[in-house]
Amino acid sequence: MVADGAIENYAVAGAIGAIFYVEPFSTEDLDVFVVTPEDRLIIELPGWDYLKAHGYTRIEKEGIVVEGWPVQFVPATTPLEREAYLNAQIVSVDEVSVRVVLPEHLVAIMLNVGRPKDIARIKMFLSQDAVKLTALEDVINRHGLSEEWSNYKRTFLK
């Protein structure tokens, strides 16, 4: 889609993004950060016309089904999401380059969202040494998540 100009760029996030750094776990969809024009009241999904033209028209839950996977194209709207999108690293998967959100940004996003499954995944990242703590704390401090991080450490890192 990027090569064909359908979207400017992307960054794999969410559970699939996490699987690039920690042991695999079950997930039902693929989250992909994209950028959208900021001045629009209604956001048109980048690449939707491209996907339709290539036969991907089925919607399942919140995602467009692509090769059997519901894919959620998530606009990177918060400063944390935009930073994660802009700083994604390129990883090779079966000789295909894939942009993936850095582990420190994934953990900060999980900390911010705070669902039970996110909290459990943070523990996976920490226990498997999948994040650099100094870099993580820099991201956390930059995005105003210091209180959430302190609460997490007090509760789960005894």
Language-model features: where?
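Compositionally biased terminal segments of proteins
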Residues: 1-158
